[in-house]
Amino acid sequence: MTNIRKTHPLMKIVNNAFIDLPAPSNISSWWNFGSLLGICLILQILTGLFLAMHYTSDTTTAFSSVAHICRDVNYGWIIRYMHANGASMFFICLFMHVGRGLYYGSYTFLETWNVGVILLFTTMATAFMGYVLPWGQMSFWGATVITNLLSAIPYIGTDLVEWIWGGFSVDKATLTRFFAFHFILPFIIAALAMVHLLFLHETGSNNPTGISSDTDKIPFHPYYTIKDILGALLLILVLMLLVLFTPDLLGDPDNYTPANPLSTPPHIKPEWYFLFAYAILRSIPNKLGGVLALVLSILILVLVPALHTSKQRSMMFRPISQCIFWILVADLLTLTWIGGQPVEHPYIIIGQLASITYFLLILVLMPVASTIENNLLKW
């Protein structure tokens, strides 16, 4: 008799994706982040669901409903902090996952890569709207500043902003719709993640060497299921260390002050995972220019496959490209630091230099390094 997991219509899909899937025998721990992102998403949806049971999306009660969750709801504090810090873990895994894709040339799977970029945008939108919901000072002013950027769009900008606000400022209507969007988007992310996997399983996984591994495949289960469980345990360990010891380490103290449209915080800044993009936005004195640079800082990922000039797929055997990659990582860390600093000398010039370097590295230096390495192969 044939095994039920290979014949049952539903079990067959699970089997082909997680059990009998042929996987390269040499994929490293950098390939763990896909499953970790799935775990983060499930965790966020579950904690978010329980938070939504007690949260009220009204400007008069939103802030106190979050305080009520933390003080009066059974284990409400742990659910709230798991959700807030879970978002940070989500973005750490996302950045690692994208970095892995860049380093090992996984972006040559075009459909998988492009769906991944859409996933990144959607996740960023979800996180931004979630940050507005507690209705603290940084929530309110963050929403005001970021939505206001759309007014830089010629001709329709102002109308577009007022349409998104549902009025003439960030108010009740804005909060209610942000809650609605924040609730629905994770399910759209889950659907997109399935499309992402669907495209990946058309080609099979890449591996550190970037060379075809068709001749040497092993089943996903038990080898990579056990490896993913180890990764998941480490993820949960780090998350719970954050939640139980320093739950507010990555947050902003200003968000413990209820939103007040009449008093602007001295330094408006987003959550840490948006700081690199925020630094790029601020480094350009022109409003429209800044908005374009902000969008392009992420959208540039779509261009990466077109800029791949190397004869080799992975950076494993390309030392010059490796150097440039790690300079890019250092540059992004610099931008993240700058995004959290006030707009004054010397931070302004450092931010501008780091922003120029970011685009220069991806658009010019990486393709040039690849071409040099191609020529070195002839020697």
From Swiss-Prot:
Its cofactor is heme b. One of its GO terms (molecular function) is metal ion binding. Keywords: Electron transport, Heme, Iron, Membrane, Metal-binding, Mitochondrion, Mitochondrion inner membrane, Respiratory chain, Transmembrane, Transmembrane helix, Transport, Ubiquinone. InterPro entries: Cyt_b/b6_C, Cyt_b/b6_C_sf, Cyt_b/b6_N, Cytb/b6-like_sf, Cytochrome_b, Cytochrome_b_C_euk/bac, Cytochrome_b_N_euk/bac, Di-haem_cyt_TM. Coiled coil: none annotated. CDD domains: cytochrome_b_C, Cytochrome_b_N. Signal peptide: none annotated. A ubiquinone binds at H201. Gene3D superfamilies: Cytochrome Bc1 Complex, Chain C (1.20.810.10). Binds 2 heme b groups non-covalently. Heme b b562 binds at H83, H182. It is a multi-pass membrane protein. It is found in: Mitochondrion inner membrane. Heme b b566 binds at H97, H196. It comes from the Eukaryota. The chain crosses the membrane at residues 33-53, 77-98, 113-133, 178-198, 226-246, 288-308, 320-340, 347-367. The keyword Iron applies. One of its GO terms (cellular component) is respiratory chain complex III. One of its GO terms (biological process) is mitochondrial electron transport, ubiquinol to cytochrome c. Its main location: mitochondrion. Component of the ubiquinol-cytochrome c reductase complex (complex III or cytochrome b-c1 complex) that is part of the mitochondrial respiratory chain. The b-c1 complex mediates electron transfer from ubiquinol to cytochrome c. Contributes to the generation of a proton gradient across the mitochondrial membrane that is then used for ATP synthesis. Belongs to the cytochrome b family. Heme 1 (or BL or b562) is low-potential and absorbs at about 562 nm, and heme 2 (or BH or b566) is high-potential and absorbs at about 566 nm. The cytochrome bc1 complex contains 11 subunits: 3 respiratory subunits (MT-CYB, CYC1 and UQCRFS1), 2 core proteins (UQCRC1 and UQCRC2) and 6 low-molecular weight proteins (UQCRH/QCR6, UQCRB/QCR7, UQCRQ/QCR8, UQCR10/QCR9, UQCR11/QCR10 and a cleavage product of UQCRFS1). This cytochrome bc1 complex then forms a dimer. This is Cytochrome b. It comes from Addax nasomaculatus (Addax). The lineage of its organism: Eukaryota, Metazoa, Chordata, Craniata, Vertebrata. The gene is MT-CYB.
